[in-house]
């Protein structure tokens, strides 16, 4: 029987753990702080930021949302990031993407203190992940959330085959690194991959993050596989759906994430978890 991986419940459990950690910090007069910088008025960004802000406050995390006009210059945005870098009440800094045209997003991310890089996108932290270095450092939230989900399954990853469809810096590439670090044999597919189905059918764990509605059909998966759908798409009727044809794929596999209610809740829960991580690590360094 197929296991439907309940991202909402796993996120709820993770949030409860995070709230407990926040309460313990507050007993020592330490409050984790998250700063989210939004430039322009992208409607989707506004929804994401509002959800992050509400969740942070609910868990007891200090949440600062800095809204800036689309006319903000590179220098002005960099200056604001640098101010949060030295603010002892802020432990995590997030610059909401996409940024308006004319702003260099990579340069802005690189300006964030790597020890406050709550999204795990700073080149130093990306390099640490890909080098599988020991130590405490933030990583990309969605892939980390997926690893948390996989840990709830009665499956050993070591030695198994994983295929990641998508090579973005936000999901695909860090996801492949985390699975490789878990001793899986990993392949990464993308828009130029030939004979995609031949590759995806080899996967014991298939992670799909393309933004292409129902790209993966029942014939594209290995029977008994675990399928993680990162897609958040709209079908022709406006219904929220994913990159995987859930109704037809689910009966063939051992476990699958639904859309909605799968990966989505885990991303914000992991962001909150990582904000508290950064606060605790800062305390251990004697910065609080």
Curated annotation (Swiss-Prot):
Catalytic activity: (6R)-5,10-methylene-5,6,7,8-tetrahydrofolate + NADP(+) = (6R)-5,10-methenyltetrahydrofolate + NADPH; (6R)-5,10-methenyltetrahydrofolate + H2O = (6R)-10-formyltetrahydrofolate + H(+)
GO BP terms: L-histidine biosynthetic process; methionine biosynthetic process; purine nucleotide biosynthetic process; tetrahydrofolate interconversion
Key words, A-Z: Amino-acid biosynthesis, Histidine biosynthesis, Hydrolase, Methionine biosynthesis, Multifunctional enzyme, NADP, One-carbon metabolism, Oxidoreductase, Purine biosynthesis
Pathway(s) served: One-carbon metabolism; tetrahydrofolate interconversion
Main function: Catalyzes the oxidation of 5,10-methylenetetrahydrofolate to 5,10-methenyltetrahydrofolate and then the hydrolysis of 5,10-methenyltetrahydrofolate to 10-formyltetrahydrofolate.
Family matches, as InterPro entries: Aminoacid_DH-like_N_sf (IPR046346), NAD(P)-bd_dom_sf (IPR036291), THF_DH/CycHdrlase (IPR000672), THF_DH/CycHdrlase_cat_dom (IPR020630), THF_DH/CycHdrlase_CS (IPR020867), THF_DH/CycHdrlase_NAD-bd_dom (IPR020631)
Assembly: Homodimer.
Annotated Gene Ontology cellular component terms: cytosol
Single GO term (MF): methylenetetrahydrofolate dehydrogenase (NADP+) activity
Domain of life: Bacteria
Protein name, as recorded: Bifunctional protein FolD
SUPFAM superfamilies, per the entry: Aminoacid dehydrogenase-like, N-terminal domain, NAD(P)-binding Rossmann-fold domains
UniProt: NADP(+) binding residues: 166-168
């Amino acid at each position: 029987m197929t296991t439907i991986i309940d991202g909402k419940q796993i996120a709820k459990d993770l949030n409860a753990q995070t709230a407990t950690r926040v309460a313990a910090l507050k007993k020592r007069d330490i409050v984790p702080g998250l700063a989210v910088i939004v430039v322009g008025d992208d409607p989707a960004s506004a929804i994401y930021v509002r959800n992050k802000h509400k969740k942070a406050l609910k868990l007891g995390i200090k949440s600062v949302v800095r809204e800036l006009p689309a006319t903000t210059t590179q220098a002005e945005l960099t200056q604001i990031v640098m101010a949060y870098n030295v603010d002892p009440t802020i432990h995590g800094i997030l610059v909401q993407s996409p940024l308006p045209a004319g702003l260099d997003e990579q340069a802005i991310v690189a300006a964030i203190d790597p020890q406050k890089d709550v999204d795990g996108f700073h080149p130093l932290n990306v390099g640490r992940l890909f080098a599988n270095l020991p130590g405490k450092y933030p990583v990309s939230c969605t892939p980390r959330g997926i690893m948390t989900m996989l840990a709830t399954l009665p499956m050993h990853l070591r030695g198994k085959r994983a295929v990641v469809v998508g090579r973005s810096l936000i999901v695909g590439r860090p996801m492949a690194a985390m699975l490789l670090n878990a001793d899986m044999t990993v392949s990464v597919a993308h828009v130029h991959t030939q004979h995609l189905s031949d590759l995806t059918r080899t996967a014991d764990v298939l992670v799909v993050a393309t933004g292409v509605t129902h790209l993966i059909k029942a014939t594209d998966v290995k029977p008994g596989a675990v399928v993680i759908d990162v897609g958040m798409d709209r079908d022709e009727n406006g219904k929220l759906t994913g990159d995987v044809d859930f109704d037809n794929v689910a009966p063939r596999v051992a476990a699958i994430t639904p859309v909605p209610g799968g990966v989505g809740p885990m991303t914000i829960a992991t962001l909150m978890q990582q904000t508290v991580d950064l606060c605790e690590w800062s305390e251990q360094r004697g910065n609080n």
